């Protein structure tokens, strides 16, 4: 199967992009592996005629927006991010009517329809920087309430209105799960994604996007880590750091949308 995929890729001048959370077999045949923002930039720069995106629907939409003349293929059309649909366009209009000085800041994990109605699109790694630099006092942060709260805690000078959405996978991780793993591996620092609940962020050793967590591990002299994000990232971590050990909350955070 792998040889057939590589043959077709060459024949059709295609590029394969895979998110860190995609299954290992998808990452193995991909030309590029990364987070949604990195892959969007790669898609924009690519000279391929066809973009095969191993991720969820909003990622394919973003690639198509950036490359309207290219064919974008999604291996699984049912792969969808629940959080991307946790705010409706009508909510944005209501907020604009309520606040005259309002900027709608949209997390990249959202539908194309929401992005079109927003003022700026951000990632988990640049959200704080962009919100802080906004000339607007009032910020409607969509769709993730948890990331929105984290941004609000770091930019207290802004009035950040938070939408009630979340990543079900990150939101399912509990303090009790972390404490149990920490008791078993006391020397492993807790690395956590900002989509996790605030009480988890408070006891973490490092907070960062998926790419930032991966970079932290690569740069650290330590040899064991507790990883609090979707466990698909384990493939990249082990591949790049075979001598290091990684522990996850139990049960492992696993998104069915990516593993389909």
Regions found by a protein language model. Give the residues of each.
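Active-site loop-to-helix "anion-binding N-cap" substructures in soluble metabolic enzymes
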Residues: 1-227, 233-260
């Amino acid at each position: 199967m792998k040889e057939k995929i590589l043959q077709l890729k060459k024949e059709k001048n295609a590029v394969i992009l895979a998110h860190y959370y995609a299954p290992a077999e998808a990452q193995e045949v991909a030309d590029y592996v990364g987070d949604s923002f990195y892959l969007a930039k790669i898609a924009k720069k690519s000279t391929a005629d066809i973009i095969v995106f191993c991720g969820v629907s909003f990622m394919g939409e973003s690639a198509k927006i950036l490359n309207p003349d290219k064919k974008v293929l999604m291996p699984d059309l049912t792969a969808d991010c629940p959080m991307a649909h946790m705010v409706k366009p009508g909510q944005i209009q209501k907020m604009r009517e309520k606040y005259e000085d309002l900027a709608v800041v949209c997390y990249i994990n959202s539908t194309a329809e929401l992005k079109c109605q927003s003022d700026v699109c951000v990632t988990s790694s640049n959200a704080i920087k962009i919100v802080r630099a906004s000339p607007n006092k009032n910020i409607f942060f969509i769709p993730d309430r948890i990331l929105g709260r984290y941004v609000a805690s770091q930019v207290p000078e802004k009035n950040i209105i938070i939408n009630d959405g979340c990543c079900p996978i990150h939101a399912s991780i509990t303090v009790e799960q972390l404490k149990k793993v920490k008791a078993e591996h006391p020397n492993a620092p807790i690395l956590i994604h900002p989509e996790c609940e605030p009480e988890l962020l408070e006891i973490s050793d490092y907070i960062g996007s998926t790419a930032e967590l991966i970079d932290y591990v690569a740069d650290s002299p330590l040899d064991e880590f507790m990883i609090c994000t979707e466990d698909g990232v384990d493939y990249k971590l082990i591949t790049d750091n075979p001598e290091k050990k990684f522990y996850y909350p139990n049960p492992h955070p696993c998104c069915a949308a990516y593993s389909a």
